[in-house]
């Protein structure tokens, strides 16, 4: 487990906005459960924007705001209209990548730009509805323990222009984008967001110029460039990896960071069990009651 670092943050009164998105099937499988856990456990001062696609989730708290994704995200609709029927944007890489990547070209998520565009366009719109910090949280997350404002603020150090969950230092790795924070008052963060959006709006000259085009890879590509220009970034998992990850996977870092005190992330096949595996996913035992329940 990464050692906890006390992050003194003078902005105790800063506005914190979180954002997530899901479709109808996602709402039934994990999304509503996430919203209910947020309403129960997260401090009321922290707002959650929910971009709902073709569904009507229940907001059981005044700090949860439901937004119709199709109405609020015209750029996402345009992106899907343009790329929705194009194989390379939907998990089928072009032949040159198939030739270059015999071991992993079949892993469709790496080239599914349309699927992951839902996340990034929700972020781009939420930026316009936020003031100080914007935090992305995947909808297959579960807030298992009370999360106070003070503890939440500590995860967003004002000296950093971005926070993220890394997967090690090997050049092939990309962040685990289930949770990240954007310091909107910082000029470098604004530069990052402008380039992030450009990569999608000018896709042929943006995401499709990269080796992979899922959102985490695009995020990591821009981050790796801009952190050399301004190294004031905060990696929640910096203390986890003694050795560099051999591939981009890097295990299940989020729950092994300080964030695991409050949230679980049911990424991939974990959605069916509705909980990460204590035996397989935790690097060391955690003291929180959630991780010790039968």
What are these regions (language model features)?
Residues 7-105, 128-130, 184-187, 270-273, ...:
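N-terminal anchoring/stem segment of glycosyltransferases
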Residues 111, 115-165:
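GT-A fold catalytic core of metal-dependent nucleotide-sugar glycosyltransferases
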Residues 144-212:
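Conserved catalytic core of nucleotide-sugar-dependent glycosyltransferases
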Residues 184-290:
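Catalytic core and acceptor-binding pocket of nucleotide-sugar-dependent glycosyltransferases
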Residues 29-32, 117-121, 213-221:
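A structural signal for well-ordered alpha-helical segments within the folded catalytic domains
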Residues 52-57, 141, 168-169:
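Short beta-alpha junction loops
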Residues 108:
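Short acidic-hydrophobic catalytic motif
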């Amino acid at each position: 487990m990464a050692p906890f670092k006390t992050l003194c943050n003078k902005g105790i009164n800063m506005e914190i906005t979180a954002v997530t998105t899901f479709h109808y099937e996602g709402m039934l499988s994990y999304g509503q459960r996430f919203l209910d856990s947020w309403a129960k456990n997260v401090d009321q001062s922290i707002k959650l924007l929910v971009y709902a696609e073709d569904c009507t989730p229940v907001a059981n708290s005044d700090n949860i705001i439901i937004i119709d994704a199709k109405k609020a995200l015209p750029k996402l609709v345009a992106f899907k209209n343009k790329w929705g029927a194009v194989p390379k944007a939907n998990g089928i890489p072009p032949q040159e990548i198939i030739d270059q990547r015999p071991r992993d070209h079949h892993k469709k998520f790496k080239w599914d730009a349309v699927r992951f565009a839902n996340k990034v366009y929700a972020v781009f719109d939420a930026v316009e509805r936020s003031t100080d910090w914007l935090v992305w949280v995947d909808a297959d997350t579960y807030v298992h323990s009370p999360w106070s404002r003070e503890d939440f603020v500590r995860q967003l150090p004002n000296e950093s222009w971005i926070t993220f969950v890394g997967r090690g230092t090997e050049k092939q790795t990309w962040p685990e984008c289930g949770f990240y924070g954007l310091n909107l008052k910082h000029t470098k963060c604004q530069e990052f967001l402008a380039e992030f959006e450009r990569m999608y709006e000018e896709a042929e000259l943006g995401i499709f110029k990269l080796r992979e085009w899922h959102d985490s890879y695009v995020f990591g590509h821009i981050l790796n460039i801009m952190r050399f220009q301004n190294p004031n970034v905060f990696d929640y998992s910096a203390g986890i990896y003694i050795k560099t990850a051999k591939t981009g996977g890097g295990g299940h870092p989020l729950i092994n960071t300080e964030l695991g005190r409050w949230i679980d992330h049911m990424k991939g096949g974990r959605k069916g069990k509705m909980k990460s595996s204590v035996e397989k996913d935790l690097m060391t035992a955690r003291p929180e009651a959630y991780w010790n329940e039968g």
